[in-house]
From Swiss-Prot:
Brain specific (at protein level). Highly expressed in hippocampus, corpus striatum and temporal cortex. Also expressed in frontal cortex, occipital cortex and, at lower levels, in cerebellum and parietal cortex (at protein level). It catalyses: L-proline(out) + chloride(out) + 2 Na(+)(out) = L-proline(in) + chloride(in) + 2 Na(+)(in); L-pipecolate(out) + chloride(out) + 2 Na(+)(out) = L-pipecolate(in) + chloride(in) + 2 Na(+)(in). The modification Phosphothreonine is found at T20, T588. Residues 1-45, 557-636 are cytoplasmic. Belongs to the sodium:neurotransmitter symporter (SNF) (TC 2.A.22) family. SLC6A7 subfamily. CDD domains: SLC6sbd_PROT. This is Sodium-dependent proline transporter. It is found in: Synaptic cell membrane. It comes from the Eukaryota. Residues 138-214 are extracellular.
């Protein structure tokens, strides 16, 4: 193949014999709507949005705990290896799909309509996650407001929500040093504040009897949705500006917490506990699985957020560079967050006279119990508490922007003539609907429903979606064709590393993750509460529903075609006639035009050699010889 460096930036010459006036009208209409779809106002908008999307709550409350329980510093070996095998390639693949087509998670499956069900599965998953994720933001807002006092309300016992088991955990000392406390039969004020005041979980008998709605949580959830709506009101035009603050300010707060943490007595004890390498853990398959899971969920692959953000890029945005900036930045942020968390936990363990592993927790237990308790031991505790929860707020909002933008973009791209002019109204309706669906999370037993959603909404179903996407693009659409599409955008083809990962390593890793999660399946639980069988069944069905959308989409695509079953499968697997770059100026090479005069017009790349004695197709951008054309035809 002859490569013309930089030529892809010029507008192609469209042969008149290949386009009818009606076709030209359609193209103009498409270009008009592509222009109205909008783009980021600057390249930094996209980069910061991706950073904000990936760097979320999991970096603070999941990575540090996973690191210290899976070998400390040795955990970084499988972590970065899985980042290279799975994280970076899948991240780049999703960005490439979105930027090349300028389409959301549903319409992007013009690449192969047979797999459009994977896009619907993405929307189901991201919708369920968005419902409970905003409830977590509501909890953060609750604690943020509670920090605006001279004394933190979870600092002491003696409040109406405390029980006889409440004990202010302060170390006892004698002349020879600290005497460790027996914490087995006691409960900290911060834990009772979280469970008995914020959640009021004692008012529920379980997931089947959620109890009453908590008006304070209900208002916090409403505020969270109002904030999200105002920030996505004008799509990426507004959210792209908000992230200049929400994606950068957390780093300032994290730095302040880190500096404060490492200067506390006992801090290095916690850091040593966090990073001391235990290389024998590397012999355990569990450690490698945990590393892959952390990478998979941390980068947000498969939720559609990356694809959506990239769809608003200009056609030649350097997403190759952006991929490495975001993925490596996400990893470094996770490690730094571990220093900030464990330095404070080391100080806390020294103050309590207990080992670090007795105070370290993961998930909400770290954010809403352990760390708030540690804040009460610091001078100016309300100030540090406010900073911590404000950091969590900004981290959570960035991810929520992506979830909502994914849903809105996907649906408006499917019905652009009706919804795109009313995108703000549609966004508001989505927020209202999700707020109403999330009200059950504000009840006394709302935490049980949140745990159920968290455990099943984005579990094995998400892995099935990503595996399907990877195989559909590389095996059905074709790895060579996909690499040439990337060449049109970036001026170079992905090398052997990306091809090997897309074809073999990434799908195999995800398949291993899915099998492991099924084999090691454990029923959901929250503390000592075990979920009833019907709740477990509901969760499993929730995960299966996203998987079933893929074969359901295949069935619909096949029924829309004509001919035998094999012919229908072939036709449904082929790219749609209008697949390719959205703007005419970027439709070069095989995408330069579609054939007219045929009873069933199909992409030019398939039929170019079959009409008018043309044996190759060429324009000012790319020249493709007879061998490549035959390869394209054989792929179909």
């Amino acid at each position: 193949m002859k490569k013309l460096q930089g030529a892809h930036l010029r507008k192609p010459v469209t042969p008149d014999l290949l386009m009818t006036p009606s076709d030209q009208g359609d193209v103009d209409l498409d270009v008009d709507f592509a222009a109205h779809r909008g783009n980021w106002t600057g390249k930094l908008d996209f980069l910061l949005s991706c950073i904000g999307y990936c760097v979320g709550l999991g970096n603070v409350w999941r990575f540090p705990y996973r690191a210290y329980t899976n070998g400390g510093g040795a955990f970084l070996v499988p972590y970065f290896l899985m980042l290279a095998i799975c994280g970076i390639p899948l991240f780049f693949l999703e960005l490439s799909l979105g930027q090349f087509s300028s389409l959301g998670p549903l319409a992007v499956w013009k690449i192969s309509p047979l797999f459009k069900g994977a896009g619907a599965a993405m929307l189901l998953i991201v919708g369920l996650v968005a419902i409970y994720y905003n409830m977590i933001i509501a909890y953060v807002l609750f604690y943020l407001f509670a920090s605006l006092t001279s004394d933190l309300p979870w600092e002491h016992c003696g409040n109406w929500w405390n029980t006889e088991l409440c004990l202010e955990h302060r170390v006892s000392k004698d002349g020879n040093g600290a005497l460790p406390l027996n914490l087995t039969c006691t409960v900290s004020p911060s834990e009772e504040y979280w469970s008995r005041y914020v959640l009021h979980i004692q008012g529920s008998q379980g997931i089947g009897s959620p109890g009453e709605i908590r008006w304070n949580l209900c208002l916090c959830l409403l505020l969270a949705w109002v904030i999200v709506f105002l920030c996505i009101l004008k799509g990426v035009k507004s959210s792209g500006k908000v992230v200049y603050f929400t994606a950068t300010f957390p780093y300032l707060i994290l730095l302040m917490l880190l500096v404060r943490g490492v200067t506390l007595p006992g801090a290095w004890k916690g850091i040593q506990f966090y990073l001391t390498p235990q290389f024998h853990h590397l012999l355990s398959s569990k450690v490698w699985i945990e590393a892959a899971l952390q990478i998979f969920y941390s980068l947000g692959v498969g939720f559609g957020g990356l694809l959506t953000f990239a769809s608003y890029n200009t056609f030649h945005q350097n997403i190759y560079r952006d991929t490495f900036i975001v993925t490596l930045g996400n990893a470094i942020t996770s490690i730094l967050a571990g220093f900030a968390i464990f330095s404070v936990l080391g100080y806390m363990s020294q103050e309590l006279g207990v080992p670090v592993d007795q105070v370290a927790k993961a998930g909400p237990g770290l954010a809403f119990v352990v760390y708030p308790q540690a804040m009460t031991m610091l001078p100016l505790s309300p100030f540090w508490s406010f900073l911590f929860f404000f950091m969590l707020l900004t981290l959570g909002l960035d991810s929520q922007f992506a979830f909502l933008e994914t849903i809105v973009t996907a649906v408006t791209d499917e019905f652009p003539y009706y919804l795109r002019p009313k995108k703000a109204v549609f966004s508001g309706l989505i927020c209202v609907a999700m707020y109403l669906m999330g009200l059950i999370l504000t009840t006394d037993g709302g935490m049980y429903w949140l745990v159920l959603l968290d455990d099943y909404s984005a579990s094995f179903g998400l892995m099935v979606v990503v595996i399907t996407t990877c195989l559909a693009v590389t095996r059905v659409y074709g790895i060579q064709r996909f690499c040439r599409d990337i060449h049109m955008m970036l001026g170079f083809k992905p090398g052997l590393y990306f091809r090997a990962c897309w074809l073999f390593l990434s799908p195999a890793t995800l398949l291993a993750l899915m099998v492991y999660s099924i084999v090691k399946y454990q029923p959901s639980e929250y503390g000592s509460y075990r979920f009833p069988p019907w709740a477990e069944l509901l969760g499993i069905l929730m995960g299966l529903l996203s998987c079933l959308m893929i074969p359901a989409g295949m069935l619909v695509a096949v029924l829309r075609e004509e001919g035998s079953l094999w012919e229908r499968l072939q036709q449904a697997s082929r790219p749609a006639m209008d697949w390719g770059p959205s703007l005419e100026e970027n439709r070069t090479g095989m995408y330069v035009a579609t054939l007219a005069g045929s009873q069933s017009p199909k992409p030019l790349m398939v039929h170019m050699r079959k009409y008018g004695g043309i044996t190759s197709f060429e324009n000012t951008a790319i020249e493709v010889d007879r061998e490549i054309a035959e390869e394209e035809e054989s792929m179909m």
